[in-house]
Amino acid sequence: MTVPTASADAALRLVRGESAVPHDLLGAHPTTVEGVDGVAIRAFQPNAASIAVVLGEQRWPMERDAHGLFALFLSDRTAPVAYRLEVTFGDGRVVLRDDPYRFLPTLGEMDLHLFNEGRHLRLWEKLGAHVCEIDGVAGTSFAVWAPNATRVSVIGAFNGWDGRAHQMRLLGASGVFELFVPGVGADALYKFEIRSPTGSLRVKTDPYAFAMEQGPGHASIVQAVGTYDWKDGAWLAQRADADPLREPMLVYEVHLSSWMRGEHNRLLTYRELAPRLAEHVKRMGFTHIELLPVLEHPFGGSWGYQVGGYFAPTSRHGSPDDFRAFVDTMHEAGIGVLLDWVPAHFPKDDWALRRFDGTACYEHEDPRLGDHPEWGTHIFNYARYEVRNFLLANALYWIEEFHIDGLRVDAVASMLYLDYGREAGQWLRNRFGGRENLEAVSFLKQLNHAVHSLHPGVITVAEESTSWPRVTHPISEGGLGFTLKWNMGWMHDTLDYFKVDPFFRKGAHDKLTFAMMYEYSERFMNPLSHDEVVHLKQSLLEKMPGDIWQRFANLRALIGYSITRPGKSLFFMGTELGSHHEWNHDISLEWHLLGDARRQGLLAFMQAVGALYRQHSCFWRRDHEPSGFGWIDVSDKEQSVLAYGRYDGSTHAMVVLNLTPVPRAAYRLGAPSMGTYHVVLNSDATTFGGSGFAVAEAVEAEPVPYHGFSQSVTVSLPPMSILVMLPAEQPDARAVVDVLAELVVENAAALRSGAGKSRSKKDKPAKAPKPPKAEKAPKPPKAEKADKAEKAPKPPKAPKAEKAPKPEKAPKPPKAPKEAKAAKPAKPSKSAKAAKQPKVPTAAKAVEPMKQPVATPARKTTTRARKAAAKTSSSPAVRKRTPVSPVPGPSNKKPVTPKSPPPATET
């Protein structure tokens, strides 16, 4: 019997590749012909000479109509029919395959409903490409959102990249096109061919692809269902029970492509990087790493911030399962993994999200809303539910599929303000006449609510560079709901201060104190990030003033200050190397620098301060509570001395910084309690590359009121240094000195055992002198349970003090010494004579370079396409600095200047 002729118009649209509903014609449909019930089967295959229907052992040739469709009527049959198609091509090839148009949709009505409302929390399981089996037939289900397309096809090598072969079905008014393609399996390359409303064809990668190839192809890659065997169950359970705000958080920011490279500048794989990075980070005392975006990006020079594949870990370093193994290795080492995530903008690549279906699909049509003039990128349309769902599901995808412990949300300020980076006339006001992006605000609240409610213990960190209020406050209180916010104001002020010549720092003293005026308005993270060591801003070491000795001393003080002040801390990779160069994303870090004694000292200092930070909860338990911090000496700008206490209810520490090259003998400080204080960290110790200026290892508090306290101590302050003191009644206060000494030796041995074996002779560092043997450190007793002991005394209100005489003018900082002269420590004060300087072994030979198989190439000037302008400060809008004014005590004694700091050979 002859099959009823299909509608000429529908048939022509299908043959021309213009149909959004190919299933209306193709596949098996119940039909009555001449009073006989049966099934009409239609097929379309470009370039086919003939097609036959195969059902079991039977085979029926199909008839070809005038439009190029093949058809067959089977009487006494009912749909569905499990038939196959035998296709014979003009070149004689014969292919037997299942017909993709005989299968039902793979998305249900509820999936589409939730997606169109922006509430589908597992959207990545429905859209994109999914290897699956339907009715015993293996294949891949494809689905994509293209609401204004007139036709969407999936193309690949499996159909000769011909958009007519696998035209997809539009599911109602959802804007989603779907098709199950039998026979397509894992690792197949594919793209979507989209016909726009104007008839133009666009070839796009899948926005939901789990993997992508590198350019110039940019094809999406079908991934099999994840079979990775996770081993971090204990980590995830502990994470869910912990309060991240009351736990230590010292973050190492990493760009995986340039942290370390292999021979001939080869990129290392995720599995190669994982054990090396975990070992290094753990040894340094960091608790977390923060990865610059590993979401697939075409341009390496964007550092990952111009994302092309939001659901695909970059294939530069391996497969999605390789990245899972990377995270698993970190968790096994006790290291959390934060991911830099970019929901603020996307690049204008024609093969990606830009005008995805020929219209402004993910972005705004109006460039005053949809374009970012500074970065040359598009801004997401947060008013569109499907776009919000894309981003929301993406955030949850990284947490659930890759066990990420937190998201650092990039460029939040650009999301919040409609006029961000724009001149007058370049932006549109919101419906209330303001400049706030109300839809972006709503999205950020939705994001934080979903992350924190579904995954307790996972954090979100806002890179928000303005004074937008309540960024880290609960959503129920009108906040955005972030866990932490980068303190950009503190970062800019602190670096500005440390750039100042020490002789003039008294005029910049409030740059260090001002941040405490707004410290508790948000929950802050203190970042010294990648943005501060690029674009001619210089490396951290080169920002420091003075000769080479002073620069390293300044850098140690900066690091110690950053870690011991309130707030969580972040350092960009390479800080520990003390490089003279800015970061270059095209090559490895300069690991060979660890052959230099100064860098060995810097590395040892970072290890020591990291260990001290993790061991003592007073440095992190109350980071975001005013009771966790108190000024001791805030007003001594004449001598550039700053002192503060850190408290934890049961423990406390005293921190004092002397930020000039002039040592201060017998400097008196108010003390929170009576008793003995041990100096547990001294950045001026020779172990760390310091001058070794004599400092008592312990000082006794005296009943002498000072700085508002009932008791005080006198301590000698080395030049350009930070000291940390712990009260003796803390069980491990004295032991920590020996523990840190032992730590330096152990870590040095670890570095020595893995020193770059394949390093070329040219780059091999000179052999450093052998360090003396360290005394065996006693095992520290168990730490006391926090918050159960009596509360540490708070600084009382200061009594009215007698008017203090003006301190004598400090002498000018000494000139850089000549190489021949050795440093002589200044004579210690009477109070320091009884106690000797604590013995800490020199790390000169001990700290050797890590494994680095190739010499570092010459560095090049870095460029960045993502951001052209520096970001503004995150401190409050009113930036007038009002110094804190405690009641002054009697002035300290006249400073004693050492004959000279240690010799410097580097300038």
Explain the meaning of each model-derived region.
Residues 278-281, 327, 395-399, 448, ...:
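Non-transmembrane alpha-helical segments in soluble domains
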Residues 1-247, 257, 270-285, 549-552, ...:
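Carbohydrate-interacting/catalytic domains
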Residues 209-213, 227, 233-251, 255-436, ...:
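Substrate-binding/active-site clefts of carbohydrate-active enzymes
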Residues 215-216, 403-405, 420-588, 593, ...:
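Conserved alpha/beta catalytic core and glycan-binding cleft of carbohydrate-active enzymes
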Residues 51, 152, 289-291, 407, ...:
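Hydrophobic residues within beta-strands of alpha/beta enzymes
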